[in-house]
Amino acid sequence: MKRRMVSAIIISIITLIALLVFIGLYVDESKRVQETYRSQYKINLGHVREDLDSYLNSEGDRDMRYVRLVSDMSSVNSFAFLINDFTEEQKAINQINTALIKYPDQMRTKLEELRDIVEDISNDLDKGYDNAFKLIESLNKKGT
């Protein structure tokens, strides 16, 4: 009986150690995944900046450039929603993405302002998100 008890305690200790190791590995992997999401978010913000510059400096085919801008902004939006503890920033990015899709005529007139906002966000400045909310508030949401 004593042997069974000792072996049960040893097995319990080994199981507890294994559980702690797996929990540690899970936490470490979660941090790595979040770092990957953040780096992809930054990379896609860079693509949006390039698309904005391309649109603003172009003379031809602006429709194709705008579609590319919307596509890259959708990627930024997707990665923003994967990042933990990023709620207010997610709202700002989502609203910009929605405005680009729903109000293209209005947003085309505000792309220089949007470029400054994206630049501030890329540089980790909170004023970028604040200005994004101001930009969205300035839109006529009943119009096109």
Question: Where do the model's predicted regions map?
Answer:
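Hydrophobic membrane-insertion alpha-helices, especially the h-region
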Residues: A8-G24
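Positively charged n-region of N-terminal signal peptides that target proteins for export
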Residues: M1-R4
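Contiguous hydrophobic segments
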Residues: E29-R32, S78-A92, F133-T144
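Hydrophobic transmembrane alpha-helix bundles
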Residues: V21, V27, K91-M107, S122-D130
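Alpha-helical segments in soluble extracytoplasmic regions
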Residues: T36-L100, D120
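Amphipathic alpha-helical segments and their boundaries
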Residues: I23-Q40
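C-terminal amphipathic alpha-helix
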Residues: D105-T144
